């Protein structure tokens, strides 16, 4: 299955694409979408991501959740960027999973308090890359890896906690 992970940002949005076959992870592509001019930022982000989706044709998507920033304006603007990303993903009829940065770091490094260089190094190792991608692309690859691992875990609650009919 091909996954795309997205690390949304105000000026730079990272993307990472991996193929997953059982436990085998294969790097496909990664990079950033730059969306400079604030007046055109959301349109540029949407168009840039659509181009990536058309080129690599992922089957599932995952995006990092918004964290509450000290500056409410920054949080609002990041939410708008996430909206453009989700709109592009949904327009391609992709299922979209969302993960907190803490959960992604736990899945990749083993601790939710990992620093960006630690995430970069583990992404490099997990995908057997010669060098680590930049921080935005590396974070996006981490989101894709986290989502792929979570998708492989069977949903035990849906089968074990099904209410049973009472006999009379």
Curated annotation (Swiss-Prot):
GO BP annotations listed: DNA recombination; DNA repair
GO MF terms, alphabetically ordered: crossover junction DNA endonuclease activity; DNA binding; magnesium ion binding
GO CC annotation: cytoplasm; Holliday junction resolvase complex
Cofactor annotation: Mg(2+)
Record Pfam families: RuvC (PF02075)
UniProt catalytic activity: Endonucleolytic cleavage at a junction such as a reciprocal single-stranded crossover between two homologous DNA duplexes (Holliday junction)
First-level EC class: hydrolase
CDD domains: RuvC
E.C. number: 3.1.21.10
Keyword Cell cycle (UniProt): no
Keyword hit for Nucleotide-binding: no
Alphabetical keyword list: Cytoplasm, DNA damage, DNA recombination, DNA repair, DNA-binding, Endonuclease, Hydrolase, Magnesium, Metal-binding, Nuclease
Top-level lineage group: Bacteria
Residues noted as binding Mg(2+) 2 in the record, renumbered to the chain: 64
Protein role: The RuvA-RuvB-RuvC complex processes Holliday junction (HJ) DNA during genetic recombination and DNA repair. Endonuclease that resolves HJ intermediates. Cleaves cruciform DNA by making single-stranded nicks across the HJ at symmetrical positions within the homologous arms, yielding a 5'-phosphate and a 3'-hydroxyl group; requires a central core of homology in the junction. The consensus cleavage sequence is 5'-(A/T)TT(C/G)-3'. Cleavage occurs on the 3'-side of the TT dinucleotide at the point of strand exchange.
UniProt subunit comment: Homodimer which binds Holliday junction (HJ) DNA. The HJ becomes 2-fold symmetrical on binding to RuvC with unstacked arms; it has a different conformation from HJ DNA in complex with RuvA. In the full resolvosome a probable DNA-RuvA(4)-RuvB(12)-RuvC(2) complex forms which resolves the HJ.
Family, similarity comment: Belongs to the RuvC family.
Protein name: Crossover junction endodeoxyribonuclease RuvC
Organism: Polynucleobacter necessarius subsp. necessarius (strain STIR1)
Gene this protein is translated from: ruvC
